[in-house]
């Protein structure tokens, strides 16, 4: 609660150029679709304690869909996958409402943790989360690439207790992330199974849009296309999709 309050207070002060005068803005916060009413209340309370005059919540997949310009108000089916840092949001949207959504706590942070654990288990090398993030961005992939990629990784040898450097490949990182990608694919399949037939027909025609930082993983669109048989489109500005959508509301 306190951490959330401090974060929101920092954002409010930053927007208002750190003015010392009392500013009580209206605040719109994007939250995961799977959080409970208690968690929503906690977010509201944190924002109000940080000085917000009014607090509005919008579910992240809806914000992402608006941010990538999906026709959410039309009576047709739209599917959005938002792979963020803490959660992956999968949603079917129609007529300004979420018909079905699934939120899983498997996303970018989980990928970093999987990379750390894989290298620790295979090489007895302990690397930091920042290094794991760099590895994920540089050579992480969800599908075999045409060109083999490698990267130098530095960490601490857990046996000798001294710094050590090794070379890892994209194939190894793909192996490390297999379970994570599998969980995301399963969530997508469940959403498709729960989609009403008339909306499913729209999604078959229009395909699926993927947003969030996780969508930048190489080959993810190919993996999802093979798993679902649907056209997959990556958002033009995936990192800002939720923020852009919230700004349009």
Model-found features: residue ranges?
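Nucleotide/phosphate-binding catalytic cleft detector across ATP-hydrolyzing
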Residues: 1-83, 91-209, 215-249
